[in-house]
């Protein structure tokens, strides 16, 4: 009867919460499997529960349990035994909280608040006698980290696993390479010595291991892509090629009459037992592989490889292209292993011819340099040619004497030797040409031709050069002249300066004459008024002397003249003018005229 009474005393919301907790606990016990995201269903349900009711759910049931456990059956007062047991028994909620806090759970952002386990509380309420045994039961909450998902593995473990896988794959690749080397040694006939063969094959594992260690990630990825093809026994020429290829250097055969081993400058292709793998080794690796051989040098030589079969890729495959990490690595896969055909190549003789071409070119170049002696065309200082008869060569461009001697001196000598026998007796090789450049700024070269009898005169050289004028233009010589023309040109420059000086002197003289004439004219203008004054005075005297014959007429004329002379003087404008001297003369003449008039009147 105690349980119904207890249940009746509890408020209705608490009953609903307890019922929900009991159902959730039963469901959690039945279904405790991780979901697709790694979280269990119970953990999701616990997270979805409202947090507002958790304090009420955690405190009230404990109080109710404590009160119900302390009540005596059949009475409303607690007994002494129940009080003692209640004092000795620790609170259930706080003990659970201590257990959860003491565990190694890391709830991440929700570590400040612990979700209580409702199923344990419901079980303790149904059977209070089993409450002390609850701590020994395993918790239903999964031990997980909300900040980090449980399926996430540590980064160090992943790196360790990747390193182990890479090491295993490298070991497998080394074993395959060793097998391929053995097959190559069996299939390929080598005409060199055994020691040279061993030295040639020695650096191949180190080279392959270095290439595989440089790109572990690319090796793993590429090996997964080509796993099916590798199991079939065929290694396809693909992106796996840098790690699966066998870099090696073929020891060259001894050339007849030469004790020097020569190596091919580019990469050599070796067949790998019918496999479509091509290995290319740089020249530096080949040199390191052939250090122990006798009389090895760095010259390029022919590599007779007619006895070596060569794998030819199908026509559908693309040409290997150079990549940024692996030079000369093909980026495309062939159609399949069955499409590749390993046939003896007929281009090996062509390869031999290509390897012999550099030697032929060098020999031709050396042969072209040997026929003429470099001392036949020399460059001298300008002071050494000052007292000799030389020819001035006007060049199309400003070129140095030494550069012209190296590149065009041989042709100039050949042209001169072709023409010289027509004019002079002599053999080829007896002539010497001396060149000099007087100034770095001018496009001129001085040439002196010296034969068995000494320096050839300039007139003879000019006559000889006239026959090869067009050929001279081809080697950059525009025209030519002699020293006399050069001296005439210098005198012409001097005469130009003389004429300029003469012109300046003439202009100065003309200016001086003009200035003198101007001064003379000015002086003449100043002297003219004095001459006019003297002549006018004489005329007046002549008139005065002739007045006795006709005094009346003279008086009238004199009075008119006086009237005309006094009017401008009264106005005052003609006193300072050019006719002021007539007014002055009139004023001086007045007393005389009056005396004459008086005398005439008296008469």
Curated annotation (Swiss-Prot):
Glycosylated; contains chondroitin sulfate. Displays sialylated O-linked oligosaccharides. The modification Sulfotyrosine is found at residues 93, 113. Residues 196-216 have a biased composition (Low complexity). The modification Phosphoserine is found at residues 569, 594. Keywords: Cell adhesion, Disulfide bond, Glycoprotein, Membrane, Phosphoprotein, Proteoglycan, Sialic acid, Signal, Sulfation, Transmembrane, Transmembrane helix. It is found in: Membrane. Residues 53-92, 124-368, 558-603 are annotated as: Disordered. It is a single-pass type I membrane protein. The keyword Transmembrane applies. It comes from the Eukaryota. GO terms for biological process: leukocyte tethering or rolling. The chain crosses the membrane at residues 500-520. Acts as a ligand for vascular selectins. Mediates rapid rolling of leukocytes over vascular surfaces through high affinity divalent cation-dependent interactions with E-, P- and L-selectins. Homodimer; disulfide-linked. Interacts with SELL, SELE and SELP. This is Podocalyxin-like protein 2. It comes from Mus musculus (Mouse). The lineage of its organism: Eukaryota, Metazoa, Chordata, Craniata, Vertebrata. The gene is Podxl2.
């Amino acid at each position: 009867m105690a349980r119904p009474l207890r249940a009746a005393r509890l408020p209705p919301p608490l009953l609903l919460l307890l019922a929900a907790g009991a159902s959730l606990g039963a469901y959690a016990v039945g279904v405790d499997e991780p979901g697709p995201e790694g979280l269990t269903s119970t953990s999701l349900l616990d997270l979805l529960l409202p947090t507002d009711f958790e304090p009420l759910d955690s405190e009230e049931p404990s109080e109710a349990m404590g009160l119900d456990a302390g009540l005596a059956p059949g009475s409303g007062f607690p007994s002494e035994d129940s009080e003692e047991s209640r004092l000795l028994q620790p609170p259930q909620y706080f003990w659970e909280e201590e257990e959860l806090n003491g565990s190694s759970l890391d709830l991440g952002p929700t570590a400040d608040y612990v979700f209580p386990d409702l199923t344990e509380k419901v079980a303790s309420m149904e059977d209070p006698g089993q409450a002390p045994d609850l701590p020994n039961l395993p918790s239903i909450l999964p031990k997980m980290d909300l900040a980090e998902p449980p399926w996430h593995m540590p980064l160090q473990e992943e790196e360790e696993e990747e390193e182990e896988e890479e090491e295993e794959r490298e070991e497998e690749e080394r074993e395959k390479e060793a097998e391929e080397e053995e097959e190559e040694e069996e299939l390929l006939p080598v005409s060199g010595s055994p020691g040279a063969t061993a030295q040639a094959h020695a650096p191949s594992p180190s080279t392959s291991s270095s290439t595989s260690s440089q790109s572990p990630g690319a090796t793993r990825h590429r090996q997964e892509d080509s796993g099916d093809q590798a199991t079939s026994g065929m290694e396809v020429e693909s992106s796996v090629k840098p790690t699966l290829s066998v870099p090696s250097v073929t020891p060259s055969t001894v050339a007849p009459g030469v004790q020097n081993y020569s190596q091919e400058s580019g990469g050599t292709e070796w067949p790998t037992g019918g496999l479509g793998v091509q290995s290319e080794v740089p020249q530096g690796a080949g040199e390191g592989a052939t250090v122990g051989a006798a009389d090895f040098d760095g010259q390029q030589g022919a590599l007779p490889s007619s006895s070596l079969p060569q794998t030819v890729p199908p026509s559908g495959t693309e040409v290997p292209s150079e990549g940024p990490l692996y030079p000369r690595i093909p980026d495309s896969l062939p159609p399949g292993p069955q499409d590749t055909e390993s046939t003896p190549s007929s281009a090996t003789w062509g390869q031999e011819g290509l390897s012999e071409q550099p030697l032929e070119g060098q020999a031709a170049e050396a042969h072209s340099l040997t026929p003429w002696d470099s001392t036949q065309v020399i460059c001298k200082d300008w002071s050494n040619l000052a007292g000799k008869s030389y020819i001035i060569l006007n060049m199309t461009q400003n070129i140095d004497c030494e550069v012209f001697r190296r590149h065009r001196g041989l042709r100039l000598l050949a042209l001169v030797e072709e023409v010289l026998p027509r004019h002079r007796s002599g053999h080829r090789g007896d002539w010497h040409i001396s060149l000099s450049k007087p100034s770095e700024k001018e496009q001129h070269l001085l040439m002196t031709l010296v034969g068995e009898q000494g320096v050839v005169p300039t007139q003879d050289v000019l006559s000889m050069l006239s026959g090869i004028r067009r050929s001279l233009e081809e080697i950059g010589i525009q025209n030519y002249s002699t020293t006399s023309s050069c001296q005439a040109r210098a005198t012409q420059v001097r005469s130009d300066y003389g004429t300029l000086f003469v012109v300046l002197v003439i202009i100065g003289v003309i200016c001086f004459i003009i200035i003198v004439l101007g001064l003379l004219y000015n002086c003449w203008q100043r002297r003219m008024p004095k001459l006019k004054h003297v002549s006018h005075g004489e005329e007046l005297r002549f008139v005065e002397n002739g007045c006795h014959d006709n005094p009346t007429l003279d008086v009238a004329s004199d009075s008119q003249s006086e009237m005309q002379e006094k009017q401008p003087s009264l106005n005052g404008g003609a006193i300072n003018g050019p006719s002021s001297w007539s007014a002055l003369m009139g004023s001086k003449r007045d007393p005389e005229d009056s005396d004459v008039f008086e005398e005439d009147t008296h008469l």
